[in-house]
Amino acid sequence: MKKSFILWMGVVLMMVIGMSSCSSEDNFVTNPNKEEPIVQTDYFYDYDGIKIPLTLNEDKALISVPKGFDMVSERILATVQPFYIVPDTFFDMFFITRADLEKLASMDFWEEDAKSVIITPSYIIDDDRGEFYQQVYLTPYLLVKLKKEEDIDLLTSYIEKYKLQITYHSTYFPLSYTLSVTLDSEKSPLECANEMFESGNFVWSVASKAYPASGAD
């Protein structure tokens, strides 16, 4: 993965350490094979000891197309105009509106193409006091830190359980791993990260979020 992207995700990591969710049953278009989006709003993350809610923004989403599915990406770009595109090594990542997502869903090709994409939601972070407000987008990635190097087998068991993949690991930070959900994953990155963190087996496990360039949305 490109260094700039890793550094960017590292900053995100420091902001959202300790993320937790009230419910893991529903998500918003995490599994593209589902017929309809399912709206679930009661997500939270811990920031400086305060549990801050994540409110689902139903109007925007992020479509991630694994590299190698070039025709899928081309059909998306020929049908809608993403308001921002994330440079990434493993996915073509397109920020789109809900109207664009509905337009894609109306196309004949989408029934098949939807099997080759990962769609993740946008959230509004608001502490209800006006002190912190940010719109963020859930990416396919999650960031995990082991307690000790010998826990790699434990991590592998979770990778197999959630059908994840390792996308980045540096020998300079042997305990830290960047994972991603795959087309076979049945849970969202947020659900996977929360459940891994709540297991108590890891120093941290957080879903990575993206922020479009200023003015992009």
Label each region the model flagged.
Residues 1-9:
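Bacterial N-terminal signal peptides that target proteins for export
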Residues 31-55:
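Post-signal peptide N-terminal segment of mature Sec-exported envelope proteins
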Residues 57-59:
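Terminal targeting/pro-maturation regions of precursor/exported proteins
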Residues 61-93:
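N-terminal, post-signal-peptide region of Sec/Tat-exported proteins
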